[in-house]
Amino acid sequence: MNAFVMHAFRTRRLDVWYGGEAWRPLVHVRDCAYAHIQCIESEPSTVRGKTFNVVQDNYQILDLAQRVKATLGLMDINVEIDVNRDHVDRRSYRTSGDLMKRQLGYSAAVTPEAAVHEIADALRTGVFTNFDHPAYYNLPWMKLLLDIEDRISKTGPIV
């Protein structure tokens, strides 16, 4: 979502590939932090041995693009959506946060619209400026971390 909004903010367009039909679960990092706190503060017997998914909801990519466009539009940032339907994205997946809600009474609350507004505000105020830094993109960031890990294993730690 971060890169999606950053691209829309930067170029005033959103490229939606594969028709945007693929599903993605979304959660804001703040909701993840609260979920971790909830688990830490819970009775150990309530969380021991359990795997909890933290998800606000599941969305199709095209729906997210439309939500980004609408939210940015309310901020006087007009964005066009270009949908490419040439291929099918096989990486479609959904998940459920029902176990966490049942066991701990916790549900993620930050909506995509709230997240878009937060990210756009940060971009407008210059909090983020180097849009091409690998930290903003999952695959380049993971590659960079692996490269650094490899380098440190060969040279040893600095301190």
Name what the model sees in each region.
Residues 17-159:
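C-terminal substrate-binding subdomain of Rossmann-fold SDR/epimerase-dehydratase oxidoreductases
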Residues 1-16, 26-27, 35:
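Oxidoreductase cofactor-interface core, primarily capturing Rossmann-like NAD(P)-dependent enzymes
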